[in-house]
Amino acid sequence: HRLTSKQLIAIFTGKVKNWRQVGGKNLPITLINRTQGSGTRVTFEEYGLNGRESAVAQEQDSSGTVRQIVSSTPGAISYVSFGYVNKAVQPITINGIKPTERNVMDNDWKIWSYEHIYTNGQPTGLTKKFLHYLQNDHIQKTLFNKLGYISVKDMRYQRTWQGKISKGSGVE
C-alpha cells in the first residue's frame, strides 16, 4: 500500500483506473469520495491532490460509511480522518511517509487540518471560559485523543485558514 503523490493524484482525478497501473493487482479502482463541501474532502483535495478536484465518483455523507464501503469493496480507495482508521482499512504510505500522528505533528504527512475558532473581538464571559475549557490539558489529552484527534498542543506546526504553514503549536 505505497503510492507516490503523483499516483495518488492520478487515481483520484480518474487518470488511473486499475491498481495494476500503479504496481498493484489487476483490479479496477473504486473511488469513494466524501460529499462536496465536507471538511474531510476539502482537506484531501487541497493537500492530497494539490488543489485538484476528485473525479466524479460515489459520494458518502459520513467517514464511517466510507470506511465500511472501502473495507468491503475490493479495489476501493478513499480518505477519512484518523479517528475512523481501524483494522478494517489499510492506510496508504505516500512518498514513503506513513500517515501517523507523529508525521502529522511534524508536518511530514501533509494531508491534515484542524479547526479554527474565531470570535468577534477579544472573547469575554462564557465564550472566554469555553475557549479556555477547550484548551485545557485534560480535554486536549483525553477527549480529543479519545475521538481520534491530535491535540493542537501536540502539533509542532500550525496551518492558518489560508493554508500557510509555520512552526509552533496551534494554540494562541
Regions found by a protein language model. Name each.
Residues 1-172:
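Exported/periplasmic ABC-transporter solute-binding proteins
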